Design a protein with these regions (language model features):
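Adenosyl-5′-phosphate
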Residues: 1-56
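Nucleotidyltransferase catalytic core that binds NTPs
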Residues: 34-46, 50-196
């Protein structure tokens, strides 16, 4: 077992070391620690601890997003495959406002969709997706890999996103969608059954 020092001398000036540091990227720190409540010395010790852990216990953070309306086997398959390729999986669930911006409408309210996804054993953390800016998401969650459906592969939009993420050391992995099932198809079937 490698000992972790209780105290690490803080350099002077502190600003020179923290001007580019946006706070911890390891999920256990980012989720549980309020940076605004830490002193300069505490921030420095947290920084050192994170660098130490990243050296000896590196983790792969995965990220994926979706509406997850009328949760089905296709959603489950994607989350299962994503978790198999990372240590910690963060899932962004689109808000009702974002869904309507895309000229769609979610059957299940956002809060319930988020709770459903949080209950899936492959998911380590659920976050709110309020916009489609993937680089903004990377700045916040510092994921190493993003998982996306392969229907986006090769499009101008995702070619640019891939290039932007590659530039910061992250990659995009495309998964094939489960054939024969989708939230849209399920919703259309329900409308037909109700005679709408």
């Amino acid at each position: 077992e490698i000992p972790v020092p209780n105290k690490v001398p803080m350099p002077r000036p502190v600003d020179a070391y923290f001007k580019d540091w946006q706070g911890p990227t390891r999920p256990e720190f980012r989720r549980d620690i309020d940076m605004t409540q830490l002193t300069g010395n505490q921030k420095w010790q947290l920084y050192c601890l994170e660098q130490f852990l990243n050296m000896y216990e590196p983790i792969t953070i995965g990220y994926t997003t979706g509406v997850y309306d009328l949760f089905h086997i296709g959603h489950l398959n994607l989350l299962r495959k994503a978790k198999a390729q990372c240590d910690y999986l963060i899932v962004g669930v689109s808000t009702d406002e974002l869904v309507s911006y895309k000229h769609k409408h979610a059957v299940i309210p956002f809060a319930e969709r988020k709770e459903i996804v949080a209950a899936i054993k492959y998911v380590d953390e659920v976050v709110t997706q309020e916009n489609m800016n993937k680089m903004e998401a990377w700045e916040k969650y510092r994921f190493n890999v993003m998982f996306v459906g392969d229907d986006w592969k090769g499009t101008d939009k995702w070619n640019k996103i891939e290039a932007d993420l590659n530039a910061v050391g992250a990659k995009v992995v495309y998964f094939p969608y489960t054939k024969g099932t989708s939230s849209t198809l399920i919703n259309e079937t329900l409308h037909k059954l109700r005679g709408e």
